[in-house]
Structures are given as C-alpha cells and as structure tokens.
C-alpha cells in the first residue's frame, strides 16, 4: 500500500472538515495567495478568492502588529448570506472556509483549529 502524497492528504483534510455540516466549502492557500487545494467549484474563481483572502489576512496581521496585539488568530468576513473565515495553518499556509449565515461559530472554530493543525503537520 503506497503512502498518500501531501496534496492527497490536504484534500482529505478539506473533505473531512466539510463533513461537519457547518462548512460549505474550504480551501488551502499559501500565505502569498497561491491556491494549494480547494473544494470550491471552478466556476467560483477560486484563485482570485484565495489571493484576495491571503491579502486581507496579511493586512490584518500587519494591523494587529501595529496595534501591539498578539499574533492574529483568524479573520471573519460576515454577510447576510454567509461567512468567510480564514486562519493560519502554520508559517506556510492559510485555511479558508465558507459557511452559511446561521452556523454554530464555536463549533466551526474548533473544527478549523483541528484542521489547521493537521495542515501544519502535512506541510511541515
């Protein structure tokens, strides 16, 4: 039996987190905004979404540092139709998840934290 390649492991992490019932879609991006893998349909301009999300995360990290705050845990973008939550997954990657508007945010954040730790382990 052959070992899974890192990309297969990352795709498995996304599929697992999407099974929670609270998360609609998810993606992993490099901190510079390059798509690593995603469960989003191609028609949604995934590359643009992850690039803009990484830019927002980086800007929020700079703002937090300038304000003397601790390291940034996450960004949450809310609209009436849903949420986009981004969190660091080690020094190399970001985990981005899309949810509906009426989620149990605490449960989602716990699942995101577990998934980001797994991503960090895969990417080293």
Predicted segment positions?
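Acidic, low-complexity cytosolic segments
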Residues: 1-23, 32-124
């Amino acid at each position: 039996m052959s070992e899974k390649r890192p990309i297969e492991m990352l795709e498995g992490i996304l599929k697992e987190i999407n099974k929670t019932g609270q998360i609609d879609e998810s993606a992993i991006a490099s901190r510079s905004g390059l798509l690593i893998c995603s469960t989003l349909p191609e028609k949604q301009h995934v590359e643009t979404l992850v690039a803009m999300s990484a830019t927002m995360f980086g800007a929020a990290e700079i703002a937090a540092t300038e304000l003397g705050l601790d390291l940034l845990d996450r960004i949450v973008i809310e609209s009436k139709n849903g949420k986009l939550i981004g969190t660091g997954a080690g020094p190399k990657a970001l985990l981005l998840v899309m949810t509906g508007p009426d989620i149990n945010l605490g449960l989602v954040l716990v699942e995101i934290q577990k998934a980001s730790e797994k991503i960090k382990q895969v990417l080293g």
